[in-house]
Swiss-Prot record:
Subcellular location: Cytoplasm
Coiled-coil regions listed: 3-59
Lineage of source species: Bacteria, Pseudomonadati, Pseudomonadota, Gammaproteobacteria, Alteromonadales
Organism: Shewanella amazonensis (strain ATCC BAA-1098 / SB2B)
Protein name per the record: Cell division protein ZapB
Function: Non-essential, abundant cell division factor that is required for proper Z-ring formation. It is recruited early to the divisome by direct interaction with FtsZ, stimulating Z-ring assembly and thereby promoting cell division earlier in the cell cycle. Its recruitment to the Z-ring requires functional FtsA or ZipA.
Gene that encodes it: zapB
Signal peptide limits: none
Sequence similarity: Belongs to the ZapB family.
Length: 67
């Protein structure tokens, strides 16, 4: 191989490595976002469950008052 071809190959490899590193960073960011969203989803589900329990209790109280 000529030096020019080796130089071109080296440049392409370096570009590929840089692209891989950037993609790894993006993947890590997306994983962190996903984890945060999963935690937020869990908290919202707990809040919804709590509100459902409160509403069920209030409906029960209203039912008792009507009877």
């Amino acid at each position: 191989m000529s030096l020019e071809l080796l130089s071109q190959l080296e440049t392409k490899i370096q570009t590929a490595l840089e692209t891989i590193e950037l993609l790894k960073l993006e993947l890590d960011e997306e994983k962190e976002k996903a984890a945060n969203l999963a935690e937020q989803n869990h908290q919202l589900k707990q809040e919804l469950s709590s509100w459902n329990d409160k509403i069920t209790g209030l409906v029960g109280l209203l039912s008792n008052q009507v009877d």
